[in-house]
Amino acid sequence: MKREYLEKNVYEACMERLHFIFEEFDNILVSFSGGKDSGLLLNLVLDYKKKYYPDKTIGVFHQDFEAQYTVTTEYIERTLERIKDEAEIYWVCLPMATRTALSSYEMYWYPWDDTKQELWVREMPDKEYVINLSLIHI
């Protein structure tokens, strides 16, 4: 693949892309893992929204896999609390099948498995925007 150099930097290209997204889409959802890349993208999107589209609603999705570094969880919680009044937050804590490399006997691990609460790595987050099985009424 041949490289093509442009007369703009990464930030300028990002602003162009955000302009296109905000103009063309009614619903904008940012997936936020708590890593540096998604954290930067989330802040760029929210800054752009404040400056150019203050009335536009942004959704922020975080899939919580239960077992992660404590500092990552703390960063996620701080960030979501900070932005909760300017975005719709979806902090998802559901037992979804996740491939595991830690077991020779099981291919999948189910974070937040409600049938194995005694094995949870940490407590379920307690925020109004957390989505978990307690919200599902069958």
Predicted region positions:
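ATP-dependent adenylation/nucleotidyltransferase module used to activate substrates
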Residues: M1-I136
